Structure formats: structure tokens, C-alpha cells
Amino acid sequence: MSFEITVQELQAKQNVGTDCVLLDVREQEEVELVQLPNSVHIPMGDIPSRLHELDPDSEIVVYCHHGVRSLQVVHFLHQHDFEHVVSLAGGIDFWAIEIEPEMTRY
């Protein structure tokens, strides 16, 4: 089972209208710099206490700056019976490089 999705795969899903939740697990200061549209923001440290806000049956793409924190959150969610959860490989930074070069990078 793959725990990651590439930025190209996510873009393809969005282009065909696939319904998935974009879960941004970065800190508030990072979100204020740049965020993918229609994202749900729950900082990584708040995930355990806010787990009830997420639907375990939804397809969820978790992202952070480079893909490290998001992968940790994916493993945590899998341990809590979330079966359709993947991490955005390379994070929002790789999205900016590959998909939206005009996007703010930090």
C-alpha cells in the first residue's frame, strides 16, 4: 500500500473532480504564507484532539511543507482506522515547483 501521492496525481484527481479532503497540517504561520485552495487546516499537534472533525470514510490528502509531517499524520490516521489517507509527496513546496510556479515558496 502506498502512503503517498505525487503532486501530478493530485492535480489529475482535481482536474477530473475527484472529491477528496485536502488536510493542511502545517502551523498557522505557514498557512498565512500560502495554502492550497479548499484545504482544511488542523496543525499536526492538534490532530489527536481534533480527530472527530475528520471522516474516516473520506479520501484525505494530507500535506505540509515538504511531506515529512504529513507522512507522520498519515501513519497516525491509519492507526485510527482511516483507510483512504495519503501524504502529498514533497508537500506544498513541491506543488509550487511542479504545478504552480507563481505560488509563494518559503
Kindly label every feature range from the protein language model.
Residues 63-64:
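Short, surface-exposed ligand- or partner-binding patches at beta-edge/loop junctions that are enriched
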Residues 1-21, 27-59, 68-106:
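Rhodanese-like catalytic fold shared by cysteine-dependent sulfurtransferases
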